[in-house]
Regions:
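C-terminal helical cap(s) of enzyme catalytic domains, especially alpha/beta-barrels
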Residues: 55-64, 200-214, 256, 268-293
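Active-site metal-binding loops of divalent metal-dependent hydrolases
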Residues: 22-23, 244-246
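Short gly/pro/ser/thr-enriched loop/turn and capping motifs at secondary-structure boundaries
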Residues: 48-53, 132-134, 196-199, 270-272
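Alpha-helical scaffold segments in soluble metabolic enzymes
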Residues: 32, 80, 111, 150, ...
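Short acidic/polar active-site loop segments enriched in Thr and Asp
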Residues: 39-40, 45, 95, 122-125, ...
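Alpha/beta enzyme core
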Residues: 91, 104-241, 247-265
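N-terminal capping/small domains of soluble enzymes
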Residues: 1-97, 102-104
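A short, charged, Gly/Pro-tolerant segment at domain boundaries
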Residues: 297-305
Length: 305
């Protein structure tokens, strides 16, 4: 019997498979298809202080080996998430959930994290620092080590639950950002967020997305995710959550060998709503194929091979 359970920031997971924020709604939508308690946990839709309608349409475009999106953090706002979404989730999901938080200022990050930290259902806070800083000229918090550290420190001072900082790959040095977050008190790092891209409409001779650019996800970015997880694992001492183009149980094993303690699955859910269940069910077979008895034994295993 293989062991799939791992521990993420002191909280146990039955397995390391975590649907990524923005691809799994608030969970209950998928609970109509299968028992989502088979998952390790999931990261729910990115939450901001105020409701957001998101970017204008079209905001999703297909591409070779992936998806381009510029949804724009559409969400009902933290008040509605706490009052409406989490109670609905509680009826179908009986494990701690990961709360993904976005903000456009330090104050917004702190307020939203503090509110969600007080919710018994929330086990982890995943802080997305890819948002533009409205008080910093629009530059993303996640592209500057000092700004990344400032968000991390401010949130950590305001909450009790583990804080996992989600990093953007659109940076010069991912390890500098990761170390800055660790030094500021982060309990974990998740990466990679989407890669900036663009597609053009040949007939209209303009971008396919109304926003112009969008975040690229799907199997095309998987090798980039493996490389960056590898680098960050070597740079920090806190747990790493790997994501970016994960489509199979083999991909989960590969990211864990690169250094991930747990693995998020994003775009695969948009292609196949049963993707995460399939990966969870297939994990024991793949473990046996590669002579893995306990997933904990392979975290970062390729660094020692």
């Amino acid at each position: 019997m293989v062991k799939t359970n791992v521990t993420l920031c002191s909280l146990p997971l039955d397995n390391p498979v975590i649907p990524a924020s923005g691809t799994f709604g608030y969970g209950y939508e998928f609970a109509e298809l299968y028992d989502i308690n088979c998952l390790g946990t999931f990261s729910f839709k990115g939450t901001t202080r105020e409701p957001r309608l998101g970017n204008p349409q079209p905001r999703i475009a297909e591409m070779q080996s992936g998806v381009l999106n510029a949804v724009g953090l559409q969400n009902p706002g933290v008040d509605a998430v706490i009052a409406e979404e989490l109670p609905r989730l509680a009826r179908v999901f009986h494990k701690p959930v990961m709360a993904n938080v976005s903000g456009f200022s330090l104050d917004e990050y702190v307020e939203v994290c503090r509110r969600l930290d007080a919710c018994p259902q929330v086990g982890w806070l995943e802080v997305n620092i890819s948002c533009p800083n409205v008080h910093g000229g629009g530059m993303s918090f996640g592209t500057d080590p000092k700004a990344a550290a400032a968000v991390t420190r401010a949130v950590k001072d305001a909450v009790k639950k583990p804080v996992i900082v989600k990093l953007s790959p659109n940076v010069t040095s991912i390890t500098d950002i990761a170390r800055a977050c660790e030094d500021a008190g982060a309990d974990g790092i998740s990466l990679i967020n989407t890669v900036m891209g663009m597609r053009l409409d040949l007939k209209a001779r303009k971008p396919l997305l109304a926003n112009g650019t969008g975040g690229m996800s799907g199997p095309a970015i998987f090798p980039l995710a493996v490389r960056m997880v590898w680098q960050v694992y070597e740079a920090v001492r806190i747990p790493v959550v790997g994501l970016g183009g994960v489509m199979s149980a083999e991909d989960v094993i590969e990211l864990m060998l690169a250094g991930a303690t747990a693995v998020e699955v994003g775009a695969a859910n948009l292609v196949d709503p049963f993707a995460c269940r399939r990966i969870v069910e297939d994990l024991p077979r793949v473990m046996q194929k590669y002579n893995i008895n306990d997933l904990n034994d392979i975290i970062g295993g390729a660094h020692h091979g």
